[in-house]
Amino acid sequence: MRVLGIETSCDETGIAVYDDKLGLLSHKLYSQVKLHADYGGVVPELASRDHVRKIVPLIKQALLDANTSANELDGVAYTKGPGLIGALLVGACVGRSLAYAWGKPAVGVHHMEGHLLAPMLEDDAPEYPFVALLVSGGHSMLVKVDGIGRYEVLGESVDDAAGEAFDKTAKLMGLDYPGGPRLAKLASEGVPAGYKFPRPMTDRPGLDFSFSGLKTFTANTIMAEPDDHQTRANIARAFEEAVVDTLAIKCRRALKQTGYNRLVIAGGVSANTRLRETLAELMTSLGGRVYYPRGEFCTDNGAMIAYAGLQRLKAGQVEDLSVKGQPRWPLDSLPAVD
């Protein structure tokens, strides 16, 4: 089976063609970072309009790169949610329309399921079952995964997600958008300097996350300390270590609770070097293993949507002719793939 995947949930237009026998045949990505940089964050209306401009040329190029015609496709997968409704509808309208015109089935994919399954694009993919840590700008969650669609959310963010906390803290430090990667780079120049940052919600049972208080603590520290580069770097490191330690503590608890020894990390924050190193050390100490996608598949992309969509199309799950977007969509409400 060969599927065209379309991702437009936020500020990246991602298109890919995936074949269940040959693997990933093409992968195109356009990022709107420069478009939104002057605003310090994503402007939904601008994001939607830019998707409209870029999506069809990218689809044509992806098919050309994959040496695939519409007749050779077996289906179309597009991100149905969660995300920005305007951006979602661009991908849904184009994906559903092309599928109808080509006489192919279409399926709407859950964006976070795409991230969760992104490590399956690698040669050394994890086997089920495993615990997944999904960390992005909009989500932080721990999920017990027993198969595709067999998900139990063990814990999630009750306010700011990890990626959101990175971006907001970076803005407090005067760093340009997108702030998360820039804050991580600044943190790499920092040294432990006696700052004692909290590890939120680790002093109580449970697997939920909360990073808004840590963000406020960091803001107060910034205002109280000298405004020089090294001090900012030290604060950035203390903040990053607090986030990473919190995520690691919760992962350890989730692994103990489930009895699993495989951990998957995915989503934009999974590209963070300190997080990868810390979780690798954790899994080594537990006699387990951590898996994550390559860097280009940590952020939003069409490849993960094509892969996830193919699994559901193979199981006979298809959309009707209506075009729908779901800005909010619980991951554990998805049907299982037998």
UniProtKB/Swiss-Prot annotation:
Its cofactor is Fe(2+). It is found in: Cytoplasm. Keywords: Acyltransferase, Cytoplasm, Iron, Metal-binding, Transferase, tRNA processing. Its main location: cytoplasm. The keyword RNA-binding does not apply. CDD domains: ASKHA_NBD_TsaD_bac. GO terms for cellular component: cytoplasm. It catalyses: L-threonylcarbamoyladenylate + adenosine(37) in tRNA = N(6)-L-threonylcarbamoyladenosine(37) in tRNA + AMP + H(+). Fe cation binds at H111, H115, D300. Binds 1 Fe(2+) ion per subunit. The keyword Iron applies. Pfam families: TsaD. Substrate binds at L134, V135, S136, G137, G138, D167, G180, N272. GO terms for molecular function: iron ion binding; N(6)-L-threonylcarbamoyladenine synthase activity. Its EC number is 2.3.1.234. Belongs to the KAE1 / TsaD family. HAMAP family: TsaD. Required for the formation of a threonylcarbamoyl group on adenosine at position 37 (t(6)A37) in tRNAs that read codons beginning with adenine. Is involved in the transfer of the threonylcarbamoyl moiety of threonylcarbamoyl-AMP (TC-AMP) to the N6 group of A37, together with TsaE and TsaB. TsaD likely plays a direct catalytic role in this reaction. NCBIfam families: gcp_kae1 (TIGR00329), T6A_TsaD_YgjD (TIGR03723). This is tRNA N6-adenosine threonylcarbamoyltransferase. It comes from Shewanella denitrificans (strain OS217 / ATCC BAA-1090 / DSM 15013).
